Regions:
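Catalytic cores of the polymerase beta-like nucleotidyltransferase superfamily
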Residues: 1-220
Length: 220
C-alpha cells in the first residue's frame, strides 16, 4: 500500500502539485507499528485530483476517497478550517497552498509529520521530537483545539495509553478544564474511542490518568 501511495505522490507532483503522506500512518511508521490507513494531502484542488485520476468527487470538506490499484486512499486538499465551539465539523473550509498552514489545523504534533515522494520525513512542527520523548502535545493553543472538537480529549488519552506516551502538562490541564464537553459528542464517536481505550490493555495507566484528573480537580 505504501508503494502505491508514493506512486500517487509522484503522479500529483508530475502534474505540477505538491503532495505528501501525513498523519497516523507516518506516526505509526516511525513507531514501527503496522498501519493500513494512508492519508495524502496536496495543494491540488479536489476537481483537479479527480481529473488526474479520472474519478468522481463527492464533496466532503475537500477530501476524496481515491481507489488506486485496489487500495483506498483519502486525498485532501491543503485547507484552513473554521469551527464553532464544540462542533467537530467546520462551518467553513478555505483551500490554501501552504503545507505548514494545513498542518496547523491538526490535533497533535505526533500526527503532523509528512513523508514526501522520496520517502523523506517532513517535520515542520517537531512531531518526531515529541515521538522520541513520548509526549502528546497539541498543535497551537490546546484550549482552542479541544473546543474545536472535544473528541480530542479522548484521542489524547487513547494515544497516551496505546503508545505509552505522556500527555503534556498544559494539554492535561486543558483536558481537565473541558472534560464536561464530551457530552456534546455523539454516542457513536465516544464509543469508538472508548472501545480502543479499554482494549489497549493499559488499565493501570488509565487509572493513573483518572486519578490525576481527580487530583487536579481537588487542587483547583
Amino acid at each position: 500500500m505504501y508503494k502505491n501511495a508514493i506512486k500517487i505522490l509522484n503522479i500529483l507532483e508530475n502534474n505540477g502539485y505538491k503532495a505528501y503522506i501525513v498523519g497516523g500512518y507516518v506516526r505509526d511508521k516511525i513507531l514501527n507499528v503496522k498501519s493500513n490507513d494512508i492519508d495524502i494531502i496536496t495543494n491540488a484542488l479536489p476537481d483537479e485530483v479527480c481529473k488526474i485520476f479520472n474519478t468522481e468527487h463527492t464533496d466532503n470538506f475537500g477530501s476524496i476517497k481515491l481507489k488506486y490499484n485496489n487500495y483506498i486512499f483519502e486525498v485532501t486538499t491543503f485547507r484552513k478550517e473554521y469551527y464553532k465551539n464544540n462542533d467537530r465539523r467546520p462551518y467553513k473550509v478555505e483551500y490554501i497552498d501552504d503545507l505548514k498552514e494545513d498542518l496547523m489545523r491538526r490535533d497533535f504534533t505526533i500526527n503532523s509529520i509528512c513523508i514526501d515522494k522520496n520517502g523523506m520525513y517532513i517535520d515542520l512542527l517537531n512531531g518526531i521530537n515529541d515521538i522520541n520523548n513520548k509526549i502528546i502535545r497539541c498543535i497551537g493553543n490546546a484550549n482552542t483545539k479541544i473546543n474545536e472538537d472535544p473528541l480530542r480529549i479522548l484521542r489524547a488519552i487513547r494515544f497516551s495509553l496505546v503508545y505509552d506516551f505522556n500527555i503534556e502538562d498544559n494539554l492535561m490541564n486543558t483536558i481537565y478544564n473541558n472534560v464536561e464537553k464530551i457530552r456534546y459528542l455523539s454516542f457513536d464517536r465516544i464509543r469508538k474511542e472508548l472501545d480502543i481505550i479499554f482494549n489497549a490493555g493499559k488499565s493501570n495507566k488509565l487509572l493513573n490518568l483518572i486519578n490525576l484528573l481527580i487530583c487536579l480537580k481537588f487542587l483547583k
